[in-house]
Amino acid sequence: MDCYTANWNPLGDSAFYRKYELYSMDWDLKEELKDCLVAAAPYGGPIALLRNCWRKEKAASVRPVLEIYSASGLPLASLLWKSGPVVALGWSAEEELLCVQEDGAVLVYGLHGDFRRHFSMGNEVLQNRVLDARIFHTEFGSGVAILTGAYRFTLSANVGDLKLRRMPEVPGLQSAPSCWTTLCHDRVPHILLAVGPDLYLLDHATCSAVTPAGLAPGVSSFLQMAVSFTYRYLALFTDTGYIWMGTASLKEKLCEFNCNIRAPPKQMVWCSRPRSKERAVVVAWERRLMVVGNAPESIQFVLDEDSYLVPELDGVRIFSRSTHEFLHEVPVASEEIFKIASMAPGALLLEAQKEYEKESQKADEYLREIQELGQLIQAVQQCIEAAGHEHQPDMQKSLLRAASFGKCFLDRFPPDSFVHMCQDLRVLNAIRDYHIGIPLTYTQYKQLTIQVLLDRLVLRRLYPLAIQICEYLRLPEVQGVSRILAHWACYKARAWDMRDEDVARAINQKLGDTPGVSYSDIAARAYGCGRTELAIKLLEYEPRSGEQVPLLLKMKRSKLALSKAIESGDTDLVFTVLLHLKNELNRGDFFMTLRNQPMALSLYRQFCKHQELDTLKDLYNQDDNHQELGSFHIRASYAAEERIEGRVAALQTAADAFYKAKNEFAAKATEDQMRLLRIQRRLEDELGGRFLDLSLHDTVTTLILGGHNKRAEQLARDFRIPDKRLWWLKLAALADLEDWEELEKFSKSKKSPIGYLPFVEICMKQHNKHEAKKYASRVGPEQKVKALLLVGDVAQAAEVAIEHRNETELSLVLSHCTGATDGAIADKIQRARAQAQKK
């Protein structure tokens, strides 16, 4: 263990820092890093270099080269830069490369050098050009801040949802600030800049002068500033060689350190971790690296090559032409286990396990010592935690063996932490491999989450590894394997070296009916790449018509979309396609398409009935559908025309159509309606009142109610209304008028074709029993009992029923007998029944 701590460097009394190698870089750099614009993404992300930068005087006519490497130095992309001069490079949280040009344009490239999009930082930049730029990260996304030639700042907090904010002007600013950076206070981005001895804080509305708490006097300029990874802390390098460290609000000072070096550093970044004992700042000059904190002494390293610093959540990555290293504060668990002469439970357990492997009795002694102190659980937990922070697999295994050894002597130690750590380390070791080149630490991995890591593997097209990780961790299929296969299929759809049929077949063979995979999404990606036929073939595998149809419409394959919509049976989907076709095709082609699709034609007719009547008429005319055309004109006569002449003309057109359809009944009925309309208009003119649009029966009834009996009878004769129906109409009308005298005359005018029971019923309906009794006596024998019961003459009804010897009538009368009043009648009926049964 003494040898293991050889690269530990103390910073003060409470913390150690160590630097270890991540990779030996094999990239073939033809120039020094200092001659390039450099950008490295956090969380073990890729490195971008723009060679032959414009700031170099030589070879100004040679196009620069943009190169992208993995963290291990493996090339990912290389492309000639054909656009304007670049001021700054930076990576977004989604690992997209942002290239900020002098003209304010920001070009966005993918990890493999594929151009994604571009946007502008405003019109002001066109006149004043960009002097400097920063790419920063907030919880909203990745942002860009620029300094223009007019010494004004503009920023966007989220390039995914571009909203430019022009920051307030700094009073008296006549030259570029000596240094500046972006801060994030209360989820709002700010800009902190230094002008001579003064610091200014800009938000979207104000410019405020600020002073760091406890800053040593004598400062005439700030040369460098750095904000921590989480935006909580700030470091300022002054021209006096002092580094002020404090909170980002500048209200609280952590410490101040004298570097005894007044030359401005190339880079200055924070090096800390969550729950850090000793937060530190790493400062890099040409050949010197210094780690300073709240301690009288600093840690210093010699840099053999030009190096670049990448701040991380829990440390700093340092890469050069030949190496890629990681500098961080030694975690507490590792420090307690490996510190010289440590008697921590984890240290004793590790020694016990080693002695056990040697078959030494010292193993028992160490174990007993831990158990006597009651610290065995703590020892196991320390070893598990320390294993997560170790980079070398051999040391990970040693610590996990020690933890496993200690667990054997515990009755109820929950295994989850041990199992999860083993799983996490297997994943981390896999992605740290040189050929993968993602050197995540355990802390970064937990912050990033497994889903984001899988997304980054997919972004690198490392599909097999991503699937292996999903299967190993047993992630739900929709979140894991299915999602990755969908990404693979989208990538495969862009492969131009294969025929459309082969690509579609390969994708289907791999995906099958995998849950969570949408063939329409893959087809959309293929269409976006210009492979329309491949997209159509892929849509054949999409089981959901609702996903097929919109894309087919987008691809201008409307007729195929209509067929798919009809197959689905979804009428809303069919209507969507029909409306699209209507706007896309000329009228003749549209109608011809409908004729070949009966279901679509039927649905469109339904639509036209409510929305487009003229189109409906055209459809009927084109199909020579005279029956429906006649019905259309009948509806139109009532819906649109108010003048009687127009309505009659429309009805005449309808009658002609019915004749053509050989529907004589409908034609005659239509002609009768025309005749009725003319009569109704004449009645209105002669008699007044409302007759138009009444039915024939209502017209007759209205005439009777108005006392125009002769006109009613004439109308009945004209339209051949049967006598029975006319008597019913007149009976109802006279009863409504309560004209009982006229009703009696009407009943005696001739023999009633409907009998006289209706007279009884309608009189009783009008609550006139007196009149009803007049007609009850005239009712025929077969309905006599019912009529007598209606007028309440139960005794007479009983006499008639007994006389008829009709069992049904006897039962009916008996059901109307109530209480003691009708008791004698009921007895009489019962005796009559008994006599009838004897016979």
From Swiss-Prot:
One of its GO terms (biological process) is symbiont entry into host cell. It comes from the Eukaryota. It is found in: Late endosome membrane; Lysosome membrane; Early endosome; Cytoplasmic vesicle, Clathrin-coated vesicle. The modification 3'-nitrotyrosine is found at residue 4. GO terms for cellular component: actin filament; autophagosome; clathrin-coated vesicle; CORVET complex; early endosome; early endosome membrane; late endosome membrane; lysosomal membrane. Gene3D superfamilies: Vps16, C-terminal region (1.10.150.780). InterPro entries: VPS16 (IPR016534), Vps16_C (IPR006925), Vps16_C_sf (IPR038132), Vps16_N (IPR006926). Residues 642-736 are annotated as: Interaction with VPS33A. It is a peripheral membrane protein. GO terms for molecular function: actin binding. Keywords: Autophagy, Cytoplasmic vesicle, Endosome, Lysosome, Membrane, Nitration, Protein transport, Transport. Pfam families: Vps16_C, Vps16_N. Belongs to the VPS16 family. This is Vacuolar protein sorting-associated protein 16 homolog. It comes from Mus musculus (Mouse).
